[in-house]
Amino acid sequence: EISACLVGSEMCIRDRFTTIIVEKEKYQDKEISSTYIREELKVGHMETVNVLLNRPFNVTGVVSIGNQLGRKLDFPTINIYPTEYKLLPPNGVYATQTTIDGEKFYGVTNLGTKPTVSDAPEISVETFLFDFDKDVYGKKVDVEFIHFIRPEMKFEDVEGLKRQIAADSDFARNMFLIG
């Protein structure tokens, strides 16, 4: 049986519990806390967030059918919508790893409102998976945010968006050391 007691409390003294005081863990000379993690998440320091969490920050959801624009641009995406209560990093593009049915895939993810193609305020997570061509609508997926690439941008036209997705994909492929 494991018990705990407040240091110096009557229960500790009466039951002769042994109290061990453990120093707080630190990372980069700062005490690890939920506040520290939220601060780092708020500014998109994903590498630090992932170290502090001891796992990658993730968004989980069921794949929904989008407007199919990514497919028309030769960058088909899987789209999920985080709950309104999910604390998220800044809107932007991230190098990500996505798990579908236990299998992992690398890709790039836009977290945000898609300002080039939509005026809607709804936040979505749109992920282009490298070397992937499966129908996963209705499946639960887990998107792990590994590295912040750049802030979300509004492009003058979809051709500019397409060029930037290609550049973001090249960056992420190089980062993940895949062709």
Give the positions of each predicted feature.
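Generic anion/oxyanion-binding catalytic loop in active/binding sites
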Residues: 1, 26, 38, 85, ...
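Single conserved hydrophobic/aromatic residue that forms the stacking wall/gate
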Residues: 1-8, 12-13
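Long, positively charged amphipathic alpha-helical accessory segments at protein N-termini or as interdomain linkers
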Residues: 10, 14-19, 56, 100-101, ...
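A short, charged helix-loop
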Residues: 14-25, 32
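Short, conserved beta-strand edge motifs with alternating hydrophobic and charged residues
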Residues: 22, 52, 60-62, 97, ...
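Anionic-ligand-binding alpha/beta catalytic cores of soluble enzymes and soluble regulatory domains
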Residues: 25, 30-74, 78
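Phosphate/ribose-recognition catalytic cores of enzymes acting on nucleotide-derived substrates
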Residues: 65-179
